[in-house]
Amino acid sequence: MRRIIKILVVVAVLYLAIIFLFANTRRVVPIHRQTPFPPTHPADLKIHDPSILKVGDKYYSYSVGPRIVIHEAPTLSGPWKKTGHVLDKDSIIPKGDRKAPWAPTTIEVAGTYYCYYAVSQSGCRNSAIGVATSQSPGPGGWTDHGAIIHTGTGPGSDSAPFDRSNAIDASVILTPDGNGYLNFGSYWTGIWQVPLNADLVSISDVSTNAARHLAYEPHAFSPGGKNPNPLCGDRSGSHPIEGAFVSYRAPFYYLWFSWGKCCKYNPKALPPRGKEYQIRVGRSTHPQGPFVDRQGVDLIEGGGEVVYGSNRDVYAPGGQGVLTDEGTDILYYHYLNKTVSLDFWEARLGYNPLIYIDGWPVAQ
């Protein structure tokens, strides 16, 4: 009997010890991962690097393609219809792919529409960001103002930060007090920001401009290249971060970006799982940062909270933006459907409403 009692006592002590151990062990929260991701809300639109506005009861999308393609739809899901182009001829910026400008972002301010776009050459940072304006969101009536900034070559390209960055993937955040900031950057030294003048189509003298470094991926995904052209191929290696977009929901500004390998996927040699395109975010109480993730890691140090990534048939979502529609923030992006094709031009529009938990966006 005493032996049985001793055994029961030992068991009870062990049980209590286990409870105490778990009660005093901090729950480990995985960094950079929100799992599982919800399914996408698909749309009937093939698109890459979308920019979406809602004007009245109609949605407008702007995307890479000849002279910047415009589509219109009654709902985000569609049906989407191509209605024309932003530019009526090639960009007036004399460099890069002038016929099909990249990654446009369109905003509306006081009845004027501003479409920011990039001209560049794949794998090189001989790039520029330009802007066109119109009094209407649809095709026709746009004025091309040309370049705001240059990298690689062109006016101001030898001044910091343009001497080390890549002027593509433009977006603009307009603060409640009316100040505009141009966000840009891809690979190389990551994402940068410069303040715009009040006209929103120019910046101050670059030699005195108050530029901010917002985000960077410090770890190279691949070795540096040996391209004889110093503007093509980063000799420090591939640092895949791009596609900056800043949204605001009081009291925070949110810096969204695409991280990981983008585009030109070989189905037989895909990047390691988790290294493909995904959508990350950091936040700040100031539009110029510093931006940090949930763990407090500065985005310049490689921080970033994953909000949406590959799941189910969705592969490599990115090129994102945030649209506020009837009080709800909606994360939209392009993605590839693994059951259809991984070809660049098979990317399609997807979206997810956002909720905020402890001030952090969560895709629904």
Swiss-Prot record:
It comes from the Eukaryota. Residues 1-25 form the signal peptide. Belongs to the glycosyl hydrolase 43 family. The active site is at D49, E242. It comes from Aspergillus terreus (strain NIH 2624 / FGSC A1156). The keyword GTP-binding does not apply. Pathway: Glycan metabolism; L-arabinan degradation. The gene is abnB. Glycans are attached at N337. Its main location: secreted. Keywords: Carbohydrate metabolism, Glycoprotein, Glycosidase, Hydrolase, Polysaccharide degradation, Secreted, Signal, Xylan degradation. Gene3D superfamilies: Glycosyl hydrolase domain, family 43. Endo-1,5-alpha-L-arabinanase involved in degradation of pectin. Its preferred substrate is linear 1,5-alpha-L-arabinan. GO terms for cellular component: extracellular region. The record marks D169 as: Important for catalytic activity, responsible for pKa modulation of the active site Glu and correct orientation of both the proton donor and substrate. It is an enzyme of class 3 (hydrolase). This is Probable arabinan endo-1,5-alpha-L-arabinosidase B. Its EC number is 3.2.1.99. It catalyses: Endohydrolysis of (1->5)-alpha-arabinofuranosidic linkages in (1->5)-arabinans. GO terms for biological process: arabinan catabolic process; xylan catabolic process. It is found in: Secreted. GO terms for molecular function: arabinan endo-1,5-alpha-L-arabinosidase activity. PANTHER family: ARABINAN ENDO-1,5-ALPHA-L-ARABINOSIDASE, ARABINAN ENDO-1,5-ALPHA-L-ARABINOSIDASE B.
